Amino acid sequence: MEKTWKINLSGFADEINPQLDEQIRVLKKLGMHYVEMRGANGKGLVEYPLDEVEKIKEQLDENDIHLSSVGSPIGKIPITQDFEEHFKLFCHTVNIAHVMEVPYIRMFSFFMPEGEDPEKYHDEVFRRVGRMADYAAKHNVILLHENEKEIYGDVADRCRKLMEEFYSDHFKAVFDFANFVQ
């Protein structure tokens, strides 16, 4: 008996158009039912209050479109910037994931100061990522660390260090091939 595989494609619809109606129209035309949402109507998803996130979810549900992941800016701040406000945004992002009924949140490991050795910031990166990973586990979401140019995890060795420390049911990796060649 031949085995049949079903593959669900997902993408960033805000690259189609910033307006949610147009994103939905094109996704439906392409037969896609999943999107990794970064933004809708010209605004980042994590910038919306939860009541507006619920309206976005209703609009997606009406069109049989679901999130594969919250495409967040979490961890895309300088490592030298205060973390507390960003952690509040992270907690809000976890709430958004619950409203959107998706366990996955794409995140990053903080921009490094230009010209400085990223290992100088190892302890602070790990403190911050560890705090988020602990929160993710307590709130049953899965963080997906993406390699990204100019962040701590912008090379394979440091991505490996992050995975060795944090890999769990609530912390995984997303690999963007282009980010290692930029």
Please report, for each region that a protein language model flagged, where it lies by residue:
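N-terminal pre-domain/capping segments
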Residues: M1-V102, S168, K172
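Short N-terminal helix-initiation segments at or just after the protein's N-terminus
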Residues: K3-A13, G115-Y121, F180
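Acidic/histidine-rich catalytic cores of soluble enzymes
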Residues: W5, L9, Y34-M37, V70, ...
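Active-site-proximal loop/turn and secondary-structure-junction residues that shape catalytic pockets
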Residues: A13-N17, G39-N41, P73-K76, S109-P113, ...
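Aromatic/hydrophobic pocket-lining residues that form the small-molecule binding cavity
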Residues: L20, V53, H86-F90, H122-V125, ...
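Gly/Pro-rich active-site loop or hairpin
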Residues: I24, V46-P49, Q81, E116-E119, ...
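Active-site groove signature of glycoside hydrolases
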Residues: A97-P118, H139-K149
